[in-house]
């Protein structure tokens, strides 16, 4: 395992890449409504990213099980946990939830963040899933502090979600991030406090709870990218890129503009 600590200048560049991801998600928030296809959202995202001098890192991302990822964002609707491929057939419906995962490469550094959106008015059951998953993200971030361990992040996420009866997907994890989208270490969403790598200041990691309304079991669709819940129940996914600091983590990505556009939905 090779973990790269970042300089302050490098963290500054990562902050810029991640802020662009936040702005891209906000731009998409303006267009998420019933009748819109996920392919339309992908085209909006790619144009926005490129217009701001960056490259969408997901496009062409290699897959050990099949071909490279064909789009600029992942659009995961309802029972899709992650890696949903934008297409013209998936039309958003009133009451859907959609997780949009977005990555950028700007000035040699990567940004990565995900947000689960409501399409129109959604059920209270789905709102509670989203609320809990987002809370779990911030529980994890509270533990991304120098001197603690990766297991402290993982345990905080797991305990918060499982206490409310939700499933934590175990096959998928967060990750280190920097020049590359996926660097060491992996950041699981389950674990034991005090276990795992000790966190050091200037480590940069993506923390991303992937939480299911039902059981945690998943399956890989025939496109070799789309991962769904095995029981067909909805899933939510929130992600921030953070810099480990002494005392308190620094969140490099941002949901601020998204939440201003969305208002208080849940």
What are these regions (language model features)?
Residues 1-266:
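Active-site neighborhoods and metal-handling regions in enzymes and metal-associated proteins
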């Amino acid at each position: 395992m090779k973990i790269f600590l970042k300089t302050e200048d490098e963290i500054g560049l990562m902050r810029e890449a991640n802020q662009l991801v936040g702005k891209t998600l906000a731009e998409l928030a303006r267009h998420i409504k019933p009748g819109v296809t996920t392919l339309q959202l992908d085209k909006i995202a790619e144009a926005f990213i490129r217009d701001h001098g960056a490259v969408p890192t997901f496009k062409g991302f290699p897959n050990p099980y099949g071909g490279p990822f064909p789009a600029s964002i992942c659009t995961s609707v309802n029972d899709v946990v992650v890696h949903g491929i934008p297409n013209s057939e998936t039309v958003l419906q009133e009451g859907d939830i959609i997780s949009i995962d977005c990555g950028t490469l700007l000035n040699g550094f990567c940004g990565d963040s995900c947000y689960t959106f409501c399409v129109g008015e959604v059920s209270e059951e789905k709102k509670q899933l989203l609320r809990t998953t987002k809370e779990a993200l911030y529980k994890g971030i509270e533990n991304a502090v120098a001197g603690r361990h990766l297991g402290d992040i993982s345990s905080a996420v797991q305990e918060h979600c499982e206490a409310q009866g939700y499933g934590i997907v175990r096959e998928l994890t967060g990750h280190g991030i920097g020049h590359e989208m996926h660097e060491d270490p992996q950041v699981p969403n389950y674990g034991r406090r005090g276990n795992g790598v000790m966190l050091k200041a200037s480590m940069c990691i993506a923390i991303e709870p992937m939480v299911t309304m039902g059981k945690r079991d998943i399956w890989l669709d025939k496109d070799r990218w789309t991962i769904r819940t095995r029981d067909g129940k909805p899933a939510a996914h929130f992600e921030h890129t953070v810099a480990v600091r002494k005392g308190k983590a620094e969140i490099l990505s941002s949901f601020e503009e998204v939440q201003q556009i969305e208002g208080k939905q849940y």
